[in-house]
Amino acid sequence: MFMGSIVALITPMDLKGTVDRISLKKLVDHHVVSGTSAIVSVGTTGEMSGLTHEEHVDVVMRTLEFSDGRLPVIAGTGANSTAEAVALTNKFNDSDIAACLSVTPYYNRPNQEGLFQHFKAISESTDLPQILYNVPIRTGCDMLPITVSRLAKIKNIVGIKEATGNLNRVNQLKQLVHEDFILLSGDDLSALDFMKLGGVGVISVTANIAAKEMAELCKLANENDFSTAQHINQRLMPVHQALFIDSNPIPVKWACKELGLISHYVLRLPMTVLSEVHRDVLKQALIDSGLFYNQSNYK
């Protein structure tokens, strides 16, 4: 279930800045038919920090409703307060959510023991599978492999989204965790190399606009056909890079609108829209990758 191309889904909004449920359903349907393995709802790319708690829960539950059992839905439930993360996680205890994705606490920068106790407390509050999420560039703290190995011994902590982009981490984690512990990349640029070293998939920003391509890339990688997967990856490389020309999800939401996947290009402050210069760069990347001329994928 937790392998292959897992999309870090954007949260579409209408011109009033409220969640656009029509576009959200369209996105879910698109991923169902495109080979995406699962959906992460309201993670970093889904603007978790820009939604109220009520909206956060509603978007996850709407995504689950629109999926209707066709794709597993993983709920983003991280917070920098342990009590808040526990409360948010427990909102989904009686739902059909497949798992929770829980980011390391941001801003307060806990030490390694604090990280261990944080995730231990969350896992003890629920029976839902927990996927750890390490993204130091966003949070200001780095969960080290030795801490992950301690957490991997907890029954319902089943894997990690490792988004440092440091491929040495894969080798370190492989040596320290049990063989069933799921290793997912959180960095599209290095995802294929991550999978070559033992990862089983990626929680992908690129999959928002290249769902079929990312699904095929991951399928080939999991079949050890890295040569063919590399051809796809090379074609997508301009997009992997351009989607981070500004803070995520500013570029990817613009690309989704350009490709007709959503109705409006709207973000919430403090996120602002992509500059004209960066739009030109991203548009060229879409053209170079062939995505701009293959819009039949997005009907």
Swiss-Prot record:
Subcellular location: Cytoplasm
Catalytic reaction equation(s): L-aspartate 4-semialdehyde + pyruvate = (2S,4S)-4-hydroxy-2,3,4,5-tetrahydrodipicolinate + H2O + H(+)
CDD domains hit by this protein: DHDPS
GO molecular function: 4-hydroxy-tetrahydrodipicolinate synthase activity
Pfam family membership, one: DHDPS
Site location (Part of a proton relay during catalysis): T44, Y107
Highest taxon of the lineage: Bacteria
Positions bound to pyruvate: T45, I203
Enzyme class: lyase
EC code(s) of this entry: 4.3.3.7
Pathway(s) the chain acts in: Amino-acid biosynthesis; L-lysine biosynthesis via DAP pathway; (S)-tetrahydrodipicolinate from L-aspartate: step 3/4
Keywords: Amino-acid biosynthesis, Cytoplasm, Diaminopimelate biosynthesis, Lyase, Lysine biosynthesis, Schiff base
Active site: Y133 (proton donor/acceptor), K161 (schiff-base intermediate with substrate)
Disulphide bridges, residue numbers: none
GO-annotated biological processes: diaminopimelate biosynthetic process; lysine biosynthetic process via diaminopimelate
GO CC, one annotated term: cytosol
UniProt family annotation: Belongs to the DapA family.
Subunit architecture: Homotetramer; dimer of dimers.
Function: Catalyzes the condensation of (S)-aspartate-beta-semialdehyde [(S)-ASA] and pyruvate to 4-hydroxy-tetrahydrodipicolinate (HTPA).
Listed name of the protein: 4-hydroxy-tetrahydrodipicolinate synthase
Lineage: Bacteria, Pseudomonadati, Pseudomonadota, Gammaproteobacteria, Enterobacterales
